[in-house]
Amino acid sequence: MVARLIAPQFLVLYAFAASVLTIHHRGKVRLPFGRQLTDHSTIMAPYNVLMYLFSAVPNKPVLPVGVVPELAKLRENWQVIRDEALNLFDEGRIKASEGYNDWGFNSFFRSGWKRFYLKWYDDALPSAQRMCPRTVALLESIPCIKGAMFATLAPGGRLVQHRDPFAGSLRYHLGLVTPTHPGECRILVDGIPCSWRDGEDLLFDETYIHYAENTTDQTRIILFCDVERPLRTRAMRAVNRWVSRHIIKESATENEAGERIGVLNKIFGYVYHVRL
């Protein structure tokens, strides 16, 4: 009986269960356990635990931006970035997906959240290169930035509590156009309130439970980036880059017709239409 319980297939199951419990109990704020079991972060739990074990930055919800010093370049050029974001906003180009081809953020569109992709896991979008070349050039000069977009949250918008599924990155926000009462437009990461302000930035671990709200009458516009998580060993950095390049990259989608849509989003669109 004992020999059967320690058979390789059971050891794999035990390791998976332990990683899911680690994710669930990480931080002060938790999803109901039933929801955690069906959350997409559960699928990535074993990989994410490896990322936490080998992380070269503290495993904390909110981090000093200085742990990734290259990001200072964005803050120093925030007005250049803001001007290009405002042009897109005024032209109505920061928008929700026009089809079911943005699996990662699909649920946000019903909550007043919109986006314009700049790059996604190393590839800059042609529309971004054409419409906001200075911002794209800045992003391309910082290799640790894997994905980036302009993101807006409309007056009254609220994103529900969630955790992102991939711990191979950290999340960076740079305030571009923010409400005059910052305490009323904020993000809470594991219960820690943070507000956006023009020209100020924030770095956090998006695999902690977080949500955002804008209770003002003004639209919030930020630069939103996925930053490669610093890791302690060359081997783990290589693994994480492979996963980013060959799996996470397949969640790419378009700003306008003709741009590349990754395999994961093609599958999502097919499944969504079949379900309907």
Give the location of each predicted region.
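Fe(II)/2-oxoglutarate oxygenase catalytic core
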Residues: 2-163, 220, 234-276
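A generic "binding-loop/recognition-motif" signal
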Residues: 155, 192, 208
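Short strand-connecting beta-turns/loops that link adjacent beta-strands
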Residues: 181, 217-218
